């Protein structure tokens, strides 16, 4: 490249740089004016932050440098090309849809903005979703805004891909067979999980790492979808214990349940994840986690050939087993420990493990000795759950008695505005 070409290229870069500065300065001035009109109290409190003069570096350039000096608050997950929605967290109570719309309107066409609010109080849950016209626009915002300072505040944007866009939902037509994948390392992304399976199973349709809507971080489990049932069955045995990143994966079943008239969903995935929701509280098996005297575990999906003694041996490693009961023909069992801590450890570590020839599902049960045993194994997990997260028809349910601020009540994100909030989201 000769000197003339280099000078021309430098001039073009300078022009682009100046245009970018002008665009972001115009956006900042617009946001300041809008903020002063909509939120006079907040504008007064942050008057100095709003007074960006021409002699200062524009908003975008200034905070791009700050972003390089500090770690991004959220590890950005990968997403499919049809996902046009981003998650935003750490919102203040005064921030509403209009404020968020003004933050992003200059960067791309905003289709909709929704802040998730508590169903009872109406207060913001401090996170929401922004949908753009295209995937490219959403990706541009995610890459350029994440970690930069929010207008008229002293806090950075916390952004990530919305975990469950409409494009990631299971198609109504065609076969779809999924597995639950637990014990994932915190750095595992959708792409990493998919690549771990793709080389062995040609029918692989997709992979999803479930992300906490409040923190934007992985919950340590996900789902992998196949187009071929035999490959799904092979993966259940072949991939159990295989490493993805720094940890061995724990594979379990993830069988969809068609919703009833009340939109009840299967909570098999939450049972596979140890019966624990995102804040660590156990979900309802047949007894509330609040009952500290309960030491009985319900074992679902039990191989019909497993004996009482074999079941006992599987749980002995976690503590003293008081009793074991396998009701005839029910495909389930009950294991009672002498203390609750042993039962908790068993639920956490043995959920999804293979006992006999099948992966078991564990949750809190009722003691058969007290005649509180469920007579139908399905009733242990077929209840409806609020605050669900869904992936391709396979669900992770948060128990209804949880603090609504501790889990993602609206993470099953829909394309239209009536698909947000604390309501259960239908999955095709």
UniProtKB/Swiss-Prot annotation:
It is found in: Nucleus; Cytoplasmic granule. Its main location: nucleus. Gene3D superfamilies: 3.30.70.330. InterPro entries: Nucleotide-bd_a/b_plait_sf (IPR012677), RBD_domain_sf (IPR035979), RBM42_RBP45_47-like (IPR050825), RRM_dom (IPR000504). GO terms for molecular function: mRNA binding; poly(A) binding. Constitutively expressed in leaves, roots, and stems. Pfam families: RRM_1. SUPFAM superfamilies: RNA-binding domain, RBD. GO terms for biological process: cellular response to heat; mRNA processing. Keywords: mRNA processing, Nucleus, Repeat, RNA-binding, Stress response. The keyword Magnesium does not apply. SMART domains: RRM. Residues 84-164, 177-256, 295-367 form the RRM domain. CDD domains: RRM1_SECp43_like, RRM2_SECp43_like. GO terms for cellular component: cytoplasmic stress granule; cytosol; nucleus. Belongs to the polyadenylate-binding RBP47 family. Heterogeneous nuclear ribonucleoprotein (hnRNP)-protein binding the poly(A) tail of mRNA and probably involved in some steps of pre-mRNA maturation. This is Polyadenylate-binding protein RBP47. It comes from Nicotiana plumbaginifolia (Leadwort-leaved tobacco). The lineage of its organism: Eukaryota, Viridiplantae, Streptophyta, Embryophyta, Tracheophyta.
């Amino acid at each position: 490249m000769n000197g003339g070409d280099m000078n021309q290229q430098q001039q073009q870069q300078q022009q682009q740089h100046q245009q970018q500065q002008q665009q972001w300065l115009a956006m900042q001035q617009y946001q300041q004016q809008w903020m002063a009109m909509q939120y006079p109290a907040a504008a007064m409190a942050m008057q100095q932050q709003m007074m960006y003069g021409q002699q200062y570096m524009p908003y975008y350039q200034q905070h791009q440098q700050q972003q390089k000096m500090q770690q991004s608050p959220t590890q950005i997950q990968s997403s499919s090309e049809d996902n046009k929605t981003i998650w935003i967290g750490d919102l203040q109570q005064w921030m509403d849809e209009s404020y968020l719309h003004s933050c992003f309107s200059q960067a791309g066409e905003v289709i909709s903005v929704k802040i998730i609010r508590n169903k009872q109080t109406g207060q913001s849950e401090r996170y929401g979703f922004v949908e753009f016209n295209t995937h490219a626009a959403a990706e541009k915002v995610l890459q350029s805004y994440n970690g930069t300072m929010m207008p008229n505040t002293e806090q950075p944007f916390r952004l990530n891909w919305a975990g469950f866009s409409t494009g990631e939902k299971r198609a109504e037509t065609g076969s779809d067979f999924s597995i639950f994948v637990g014990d994932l390392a915190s750095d595992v992304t959708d792409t990493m999980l998919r690549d771990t399976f793709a080389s062995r199973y040609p029918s692989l349709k997709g992979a999803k790492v479930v992300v906490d809507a409040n923190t934007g971080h992985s919950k340590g489990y996900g789902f992998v979808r196949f187009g071929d049932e035999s490959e799904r069955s092979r993966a259940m045995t072949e991939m159990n214990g295989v490493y993805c990143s720094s940890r061995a994966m724990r594979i379990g079943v993830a069988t969809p349940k068609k919703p009833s008239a009340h939109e009840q969903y299967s909570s098999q995935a939450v049972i596979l994840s140890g019966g624990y929701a995102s804040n660590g509280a156990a979900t309802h098996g047949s007894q509330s986690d609040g009952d500290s005297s309960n030491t009985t575990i319900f074992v679902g999906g039990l191989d019909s050939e497993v004996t009482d003694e074999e079941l006992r041996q599987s749980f002995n490693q976690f503590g003293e087993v008081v009793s074991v009961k396998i009701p005839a023909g029910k495909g389930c069992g009950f294991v009672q420990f002498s203390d609750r801590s042993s039962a908790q450890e068993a639920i956490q570590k043995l959920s999804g493990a293979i006992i006999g020839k099948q992966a078991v599902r564990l949750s809190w049960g009722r003691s058969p000795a007290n005649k509180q045993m469920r007579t139908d194994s399905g009733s242990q997990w077929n209840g409806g759950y609020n605050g669900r997260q869904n992936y391709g028809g396979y669900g992770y349910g948060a128990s209804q008695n949880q603090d609504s601020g501790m889990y993602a009540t609206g993470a099953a994100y829909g394309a239209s505005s009536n698909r947000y909030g604390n309501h259960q989201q239908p999955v095709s």
